[in-house]
Swiss-Prot record:
Signal peptide: none
NCBIfam families: mthyl_TIGR00027
Species of the source: Mycobacterium ulcerans (strain Agy99)
Biological role stated in the UniProt entry: Exhibits S-adenosyl-L-methionine-dependent methyltransferase activity.
Family listed: Belongs to the UPF0677 family.
Enzyme class: transferase
Name under which the protein is recorded: Putative S-adenosyl-L-methionine-dependent methyltransferase MUL_0817
Amino acid sequence: MNRRTDADSWDPASSVGATATMVAASRARASRGPDALLDDRLAGPLVRAVGLQPLVRMIDGDTAVDDPPSSPRSLNEQIAVRTRYFDDFFTAAGAGGIRQAVILASGLDTRAYRLNWPSGMTVYEIDQPQVIEFKTRTLAEFGALPCPDHRPIGIDLREDWPSALRQRGFDAGQPTAWIAEGLLVYLPPEAQDRLFDNIAELSTPRSQVATEHFPDPNGFSGPRAQRLSERWHRMGMDLDMAELIYHGDRNTVIDYLADHGWRVRARTFEEMHAHNGFEPPDDEMMALFGGMSYVTGIRK
């Protein structure tokens, strides 16, 4: 595959879009069986509709992910920790009175359809036009219903997405809950800063943002990227992490948010496993995600 360019685009079966489908397949796998760790009943049908056969086989259980020393249980726990963190973030924001939610780079995220949103909540989703069109059309064909006020927006986050958001009725005078899940490494370093600058500009006090933080902002280059690529290849996916991410020095999330008007709380990868009642992550999970924190910022 080719290295990223500033004008590239994708659908759920290609490039960065395929990684979103892979995450959906992980949610589907963790939602299977009597010991399911998640309840995302739409993830599996979406993955089937995309049609990437290695991922279809994975959710069907027809092929094991040959990924020692990580067990299937460890892999399911990892995606459960991540998914629950952002689910709980939105649930708490709604309980606290926030009535605007924005899912940035939503991919095959189904929260607009499966979370119990409070009355009056408006949920915006932003992603590539092909991704938004595929998901909304496919879920409509399945008969899935989103929350009553669901406003998907097809635009690249490297473009003027704040204007597109306002055009769909976003009210910058009201507190908002934002998530940027699994997104930042796919943005150029300057676009990451611009993303958080735009979020800050659109956020009144009491607004909240949730994302992930790595103490080494270039942590997904080098050995981590190689490990992920090897895992994907064993699954039958022709993806190379080093070709999908943007390289170069970037600001650390916690410091950038703290320096730009947010009160920040971070919970480590290991802490969140314990919070969910899981055993400590195994060595392979730590090699991939050790040092990572889940971060919430509250606008001052």
